Structures are given as C-alpha cells and as structure tokens.
C-alpha cells in the first residue's frame, strides 16, 4: 500500500482529471498561438544575433556581452 503524506493529499485534486480528454479542440488554439509567439521571439533573437535586424545602440559582440 502506498504511503499517504500531507503533500499527497494536497496535490490529489490536481490528479483527479487524469485520463480524461476534453471534447473537441480544447485548448489547442491557445497552444498554437503561444507556439507562434515563441517562434517569432526566437526569430527576432536570431536576427539580432545575425545582425539582420540592426537596433540602435545594441552591439552584438562577445567582448561586450561579458562586460
């Protein structure tokens, strides 16, 4: 038999929906929006690093990153 702890009792309600699937699309559209925003964030960071996107007073150099 599993050991019952206070923490386990507190966390039990979070696991009550285990195995159940919401009908329809659920939160998939929200996940898609966040994935798109994360992709845009990574794209902007890559462009800044690659100097494709030049910002005033932002110098991308390993020597200046350490100071």
Swiss-Prot record:
One Pfam family of this chain: PsbH
Job of this protein: One of the components of the core complex of photosystem II (PSII), required for its stability and/or assembly. PSII is a light-driven water:plastoquinone oxidoreductase that uses light energy to abstract electrons from H(2)O, generating O(2) and a proton gradient subsequently used for ATP formation. It consists of a core antenna complex that captures photons, and an electron transfer chain that converts photonic excitation into a charge separation.
Alphabetical list of SUPFAM superfamilies matching this protein: Photosystem II 10 kDa phosphoprotein PsbH (SSF161025)
Record family assignment: Belongs to the PsbH family.
Topology class, membrane: Single-pass membrane protein
Keywords, ordered alphabetically: Chloroplast, Membrane, Photosynthesis, Photosystem II, Plastid, Thylakoid, Transmembrane, Transmembrane helix
Coarse class of the protein's main subcellular location: plastid
Organism: Porphyra purpurea
GO process terms (BP): photosynthesis; protein stabilization
Subunit structure: PSII is composed of 1 copy each of membrane proteins PsbA, PsbB, PsbC, PsbD, PsbE, PsbF, PsbH, PsbI, PsbJ, PsbK, PsbL, PsbM, PsbT, PsbX, PsbY, PsbZ, Psb30/Ycf12, at least 3 peripheral proteins of the oxygen-evolving complex and a large number of cofactors. It forms dimeric complexes.
PANTHER family linked to this entry: PHOTOSYSTEM II REACTION CENTER PROTEIN H
Gene Ontology cellular component list: chloroplast thylakoid membrane; photosystem II
GO molecular function: phosphate ion binding
Highest rank taxon of the organism: Eukaryota
Transmembrane segments: 29-49
Record localization: Plastid, Chloroplast thylakoid membrane
Entry protein name: Photosystem II reaction center protein H
InterPro entries per the UniProt record, alphabetical: PSII_PsbH, PSII_PsbH_sf
